[in-house]
């Protein structure tokens, strides 16, 4: 139903893992993984805004939001308030009231993520502090995104279950991806498994 609606609204092509009858008449870009493709296409569509930001990414079972706000406050002083924030509570894309709003996810969906990065860059932001949930990696919302600094706070079995991570190993693997994709890493010395 979404494809038919998009077609009615003027879509000129669609990206999917298979062709759909509702897309007849539209070019189909067939990919192996829609979520990964969406992240890469989002970055390209919005002109790779991440390349214009110094990005500090924070992951952990507990403490992401508090750490993000501490980092934001410290960097605000050294960047003359040219810092964006993507947290569980708020997204701040600039210094005007309309650039500050409540978040609906810890880490936004890929199109929202790159859109908001573009707005932040266009608003003169030079730095971004963002929380990165393990679900963001599991769902490939941030596929292809690299960070200047990655901070790994901790890990515990809080999010193990059928709705999030089936095993602790899966949760750990997702969180470790932040380290793999960071130029520099900070790891809490008290974190088990490290």
Which role fits each region the language model picked out?
Residues 98-109, 158-166:
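Flexible beta-alpha connector loops of hexameric P-loop NTPases
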Residues 101-130:
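Conserved nucleotide-sensing/catalytic segment adjacent to the nucleotide-binding pocket
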Residues 1-40:
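N-terminal leader/targeting and accessory segments in enzymes
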Residues 6, 41, 58, 86, ...:
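Residue-level signal for inorganic ion chemistry
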Residues 43-93, 98:
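Walker A (P-loop) phosphate-binding motif
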Residues 124-138, 142:
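Glycine-rich phosphate-binding loop used to anchor ATP phosphates in small-molecule kinases
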């Amino acid at each position: 139903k979404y494809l038919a609606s998009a077609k009615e609204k003027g879509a000129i092509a669609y990206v999917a893992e298979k062709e759909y009858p509702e897309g007849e008449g539209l070019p189909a870009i067939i990919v192996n993984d829609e979520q990964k493709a969406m992240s890469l296409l989002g970055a390209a569509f919005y002109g790779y805004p991440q390349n214009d930001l110094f990005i500090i990414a924070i992951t952990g079972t507990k403490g992401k939001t508090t750490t993000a706000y501490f980092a934001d406050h410290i960097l605000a002083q050294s960047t003359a308030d040219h810092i964006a924030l993507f947290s569980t509570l708020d997204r701040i894309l600039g210094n005007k009231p309309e650039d500050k709003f409540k978040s609906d996810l810890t880490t936004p969906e890929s199109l929202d993520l790159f859109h908001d990065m573009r707005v932040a860059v266009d608003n003169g932001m030079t730095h971004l502090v963002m929380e990165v949930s393990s679900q963001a990696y599991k769902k490939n919302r941030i596929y292809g995104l690299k960070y200047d600094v990655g901070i790994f706070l901790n890990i515990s079995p809080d999010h193990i279950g059928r709705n999030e991570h089936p095993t602790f190993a899966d949760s750990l693997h997702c969180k470790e991806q932040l380290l793999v994709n960071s130029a520099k890493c900070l790891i809490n010395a008290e974190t088990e498994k490290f």
